[in-house]
Amino acid sequence: MSNTKTKTPAKASARKRRADAERSIASIIDAALEALAIDPDASMAEIARRAGVVRATVYMHFPTRESLLDAVMEHAVGQVAEATSGAEPTQGEPEEALERVLRATWHKLSDFHTLLAINTSRLPASELHRRHEPVMSLFVPLIERGQEKGVFRSDLPVAWHLAMVRAIAHAASAEVRSGRIEESSVEDALIATALNALSPS
């Protein structure tokens, strides 16, 4: 009986510490996204300041800048994957579904132009591809369905179509970030380019 009483407060305390740590990590990741959007070279000290914590707290959770960038990237990919999935890629006619999904994906991706540029420069192409898999895998059934219905090219493998869509989206992001193209005009161009490339005619 006494053992139960002594263990319960300890478990509650451990849960509180975990919850506090999770909140701290979330605030640091949010702060990193804000800071990096303004300055790709933002320091750990600046990120700590924005998160409202001391620098030691940032290093406690993320021992290196690379580990923080990895966590921020994982968070961003999760956000984009959620938006992509929420657009219901398995519903409707393939062409309409692709347009709907690309719009949803682009709307969320547009929050992360600078982060995408940072990761493109720091990671090998193969690693960048692997980390984007949670998003790109959602396009596979959609493209396969379009090929089966004859509205998407079937003479090229799905992997090629995925690489093409990813490359167009990344190029669009780079153009917006450079200021060469207005973001308001990119979305329709992105979708038209992807649909034209996939069309068998």
Predicted segments with their positions:
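Hydrophobic alpha-helical connector segments
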Residues: 71, 82-110, 124, 187
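Basic, helix-initiating cap at the start of DNA-binding domains
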Residues: 1-38, 42-50, 67
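Solvent-exposed, amphipathic alpha-helical segments
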Residues: 31-38, 79-90, 108, 167-175
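Alpha-helical DNA-contacting segments of helix-turn-helix folds
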Residues: 62, 69-76
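Amphipathic, non-transmembrane alpha-helical scaffold segments
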Residues: 21, 25, 73, 77, ...
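Hydrophobic/aromatic-rich alpha-helical bundle segments in the mid-to-C-terminal region
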Residues: 116-121, 125, 129, 133, ...
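Short hydrophobic/aromatic patch on the recognition helix
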Residues: 52-62
